[in-house]
Amino acid sequence: MKKVLNKYSRRLTEDKSQGASQAMLYGTEMNDADMHKPQIGIGSVWYEGNTCNMHLNQLAQFVKDSVEKENLKGMRFNTIGVSDGISMGTDGMSYSLQSRDLIADSIETVMSAHWYDGLVSIPGCDKNMPGCMMALGRLNRPGFVIYGGTIQAGVMRGKPIDIVTAFQSYGACLSGQITEQERQETIKKACPGAGACGGMYTANTMACAIEALGMSLPFSSSTSATSVEKVQECDKAGETIKNLLELDIKPRDIMTRKAFENAMVLITVMGGSTNAVLHLLAMASSVDVDLSIDDFQEIANKTPVLADFKPSGKYVKANLHAIGGTPAVMKMLLKAGMLHGDCLTVTGKTLAENLENVADLPEDNTIIHKLDNPIKKTGHLQILKGNVAPEGSVAKITGKEGEIFEGVANVFDSEEEMVAAVETGKVKKGDVIVIRYEGPKGGPGMPEMLKPTSLIMGAGLGQDVALITDGRFSGGSHGFIVGHITPEAYEGGMIALLENGDKITIDAINNVINVDLSDQEIAQRKSKWRASKQKASRGTLKKYIKTVSSA
């Protein structure tokens, strides 16, 4: 008996009582044969205003062509996106994290309302990645991700530069390290075309995580946006989704607990973004896999950092593709017993089977260190707790900035206040910069603090100050930084009670973050604290404040 592959779409296309549905589909130039084909949603996060996303509509057309060669019906649709790089440092960043959930909601909505049988999702930027994955997990229909791909490095006066070079150029100009002319040249040459920000920033981090999970094709996370290989990946979409339909392999068959452990190992080895903690937790929730921040610490305790990628290192993701790409790194880890090779993937094969014929990394490569010569012996993503963060926080400590920092609090109630302080020389060596009321509810939307960290690095203070916040950090942030402090200031967390001059210790060896205050002093400050007014009184951010939970 022939297997039914259009088990969802036939609800509309083969039911005589759905004549109006069929009339509208005929109106889209579908014919009689098309009515019996499985319908594949091709969900792109295309829009023109961002290098990460501007080419995705073209990739979606390549995918549609591939799907229809397999006697399937491709149905392209779009969802929204927010460019963190463009909105960074402005109130627009409040919309970034909530865009992840809007993307997931909108893909789920279109797929469910139109009864599509499978999904090929094409994200390009930071929050696109988990948003698409959350939708796939909720729907649990055959589907996978095609990453839009990484950007090529920019070149200025013979040296490679990227988006973080552009972010840091303002601080460098303020401190006299570069001229205004050099700053202008930097920002014009940092982004040479289509593709996601090139270092191990959030989009590339999540692309690695998705490939390690088995939810994208091998090499998807390391091929460049404008490469022939990316087009070839799109050309494989039809046979891949048809195979998933025929084998009835669904996201929840792939996104298992062991697969998430693979993802956590890979992003640790790669030196990935702190945002991976938030996003992997949300992705796991979408498929009912029990994952907590403590699981990240367990992985960090036994997993080294091996990759020398920007922002703290030398290389961009395009450099990795030239020496074998993400699969070559995973093959090394599999050989070392650090990955679960028996996990199923969207190829219909196991992870180990996918990696069987992948070439080893070149012995003399300088991008991925050997296991016996790590950049850091344990993971860079450290979960810190203490009286500053009783419910936890996420630190990004590569080891290059040290592992313990003691200093005095320099407190700011917004990102803007801190930026103004740097501009006027009010941030000094030995400061623990505190930026608060930037959490999920207080921000709102938990904006990323890339502008402050870039100013710090650009001003040459990267080794001399620490920054803690109830907001987030971009994958482009580096230095001695601790984010996701919970409870957040808006809800009366300890970070709301800190004052200028308080002595703060950040210890990434023992995983603690404490302020030197007695319980009596803390209780006294707490009694005087009053909740601040919501920053959003209408619209989507008001809804977000009402529904979002603690980081």
UniProtKB/Swiss-Prot annotation:
Residues the entry annotates as binding [2Fe-2S] cluster: C52, C125, C197
Details of cofactor binding: Binds 1 [2Fe-2S] cluster per subunit. This cluster acts as a Lewis acid cofactor.
Function of the protein: Functions in the biosynthesis of branched-chain amino acids. Catalyzes the dehydration of (2R,3R)-2,3-dihydroxy-3-methylpentanoate (2,3-dihydroxy-3-methylvalerate) into 2-oxo-3-methylpentanoate (2-oxo-3-methylvalerate) and of (2R)-2,3-dihydroxy-3-methylbutanoate (2,3-dihydroxyisovalerate) into 2-oxo-3-methylbutanoate (2-oxoisovalerate), the penultimate precursor to L-isoleucine and L-valine, respectively.
Oligomeric and partner information: Homodimer.
EC number of the protein: 4.2.1.9
Similarity section: Belongs to the IlvD/Edd family.
Residue numbers bearing the N6-carboxylysine modification: K127
Protein's pathway: Amino-acid biosynthesis; L-isoleucine biosynthesis; L-isoleucine from 2-oxobutanoate: step 3/4; Amino-acid biosynthesis; L-valine biosynthesis; L-valine from pyruvate: step 3/4
Cofactor(s), names only, from the UniProt record: [2Fe-2S] cluster; Mg(2+)
Organism, as annotated: Francisella tularensis subsp. tularensis (strain SCHU S4 / Schu 4)
Keywords: 2Fe-2S, Amino-acid biosynthesis, Branched-chain amino acid biosynthesis, Iron, Iron-sulfur, Lyase, Magnesium, Metal-binding
One Gene Ontology molecular-function label: 2 iron, 2 sulfur cluster binding
Pfam families given in the database record: ILV_EDD_C (PF24877), ILVD_EDD_N (PF00920)
Enzymatic reactions: (2R)-2,3-dihydroxy-3-methylbutanoate = 3-methyl-2-oxobutanoate + H2O; (2R,3R)-2,3-dihydroxy-3-methylpentanoate = (S)-3-methyl-2-oxopentanoate + H2O
A GO BP annotation: isoleucine biosynthetic process
Lineage, uppermost ranks: Bacteria, Pseudomonadati, Pseudomonadota, Gammaproteobacteria, Thiotrichales
This protein's name: Dihydroxy-acid dehydratase
Residues annotated as catalytic: S474
Matches recorded under HAMAP family: IlvD
Enzyme class: lyase
Residues binding Mg(2+): D84, D126, K127, E448
